[in-house]
Amino acid sequence: MNKNDFAKNPPMGWKSWDCYGASVTEKELKQNADYMAEHLKQYGWEYVVCDIQWYEPTADSSHYPKFADLCMDEYGRLIPAENRFPSAKEGKGFKEIADYVHEKGLKFGIHIMRGIPRQAVSANVTIKGTSY
C-alpha cells in the first residue's frame, strides 16, 4: 500500500447528534443542510446525517428513555417519528428530506443500529418476506 491509496481528506459533514442529541427535527435538519450548502460545501463538506433516535417521538435530549415506544412499520422496521419529521407521513419515510438535501448537492444519511428492535421482538412481528 502506498501513500496515494488513502483519501486526501476525511469524510466531511454534519451529524445531528453533535448539536441536538437525539432530538433533531425536520426543520432543524433542513436549516443545517441550508447552512452547509451555502457556507461549507465549497470546502468539501458533503454529508448531512440524521443521527440516532429519529424513530423515537418523545426524544428531547441525549437521554435514551428505556423502552420508549418507537415508530415502526408492520414488519418491525424503524420509520421516522412523524411528529418530528412531518414529511414522513403516510409511509413516505425520509424521501422528501433526502431529495431536499440532494438538491443542494449534498449527501443524506441516517444513523441506524444493526439487528431487530426489541419492540419488534416483543410484538412478535413477521420479518418481511419470511414466515417468521
Where are these regions (language model features)?
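Aromatic-lined carbohydrate-binding/catalytic grooves of carbohydrate-active enzymes
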Residues: N32, M36-Y132
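Mature N-terminal, pre-catalytic/accessory segment of carbohydrate-active enzymes
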Residues: M1-T25
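Active-site beta-loop-alpha junctions of metal-dependent nucleic acid enzymes
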Residues: E28
